[in-house]
């Protein structure tokens, strides 16, 4: 129990803290399509009667949550 622990050398960890420099890009000068679609128009799934929804509804009702149906 009289052994003293050697301090841990953290020199290698500190080297990882440096960041790589990248040249600045001119994004303002790019021609962009005004009508570009970022995602599909039908991204919102309106089908609330699929298997997952039914299982989730049943599980929530088991825990006391009352689900409203349209």
UniProtKB/Swiss-Prot annotation:
* GO BP annotations listed: double-strand break repair via homologous recombination; mRNA export from nucleus; proteasome assembly; proteasome-mediated ubiquitin-dependent protein catabolic process
Keywords from the named record: Nucleus, Proteasome
The superkingdom listed in its UniProt entry is Eukaryota
Compartments in which it is found? Nucleus
Q: Which Pfam families match?
A: DSS1_SEM1
Q: Which GO terms describe its cellular component?
A: cytosol; integrator complex; nucleoplasm; proteasome complex; proteasome regulatory particle, lid subcomplex; protein-containing complex
Tissue-level expression reads:
Expressed in limb bud, craniofacial primordia and skin.
PANTHER family in the record, alphabetically?
26 PROTEASOME COMPLEX SUBUNIT DSS1 (PTHR16771), 26S PROTEASOME COMPLEX SUBUNIT SEM1 (PTHR16771:SF0)
What is the role of the protein in this entry?
Component of the 26S proteasome, a multiprotein complex involved in the ATP-dependent degradation of ubiquitinated proteins. This complex plays a key role in the maintenance of protein homeostasis by removing misfolded or damaged proteins, which could impair cellular functions, and by removing proteins whose functions are no longer required. Therefore, the proteasome participates in numerous cellular processes, including cell cycle progression, apoptosis, or DNA damage repair.
Quaternary structure per UniProt? Component of the 19S proteasome regulatory particle complex. The 26S proteasome consists of a 20S core particle (CP) and two 19S regulatory subunits (RP). The regulatory particle is made of a lid composed of 9 subunits including SEM1, a base containing 6 ATPases and few additional components. Belongs to the TREX-2 complex (transcription and export complex 2), composed of at least ENY2, GANP, PCID2, SEM1, and either centrin CETN2 or CETN3. Component of the homologous recombination repair (HR) complex composed of ERCC5/XPG, BRCA2, PALB2, DSS1 and RAD51. Interacts with the C-terminal of BRCA2.
Tell me its family.
Answer: Belongs to the DSS1/SEM1 family.
**Entry protein name:** 26S proteasome complex subunit SEM1
Q: Which organism is it from?
A: Homo sapiens
* Gene (UniProt): SEM1
């Amino acid at each position: 129990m009289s052994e003293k622990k050697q301090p841990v050398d953290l020199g290698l960890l500190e080297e990882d803290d440096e960041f790589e420099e990248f040249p600045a890009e001119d994004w303002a000068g790019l021609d962009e399509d005004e009508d570009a679609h970022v995602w599909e128009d039908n991204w919102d799934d309106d089908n609330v009667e699929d298997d997952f929804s039914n299982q989730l509804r049943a599980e929530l009702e088991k825990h006391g949550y009352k689900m409203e149906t349209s």
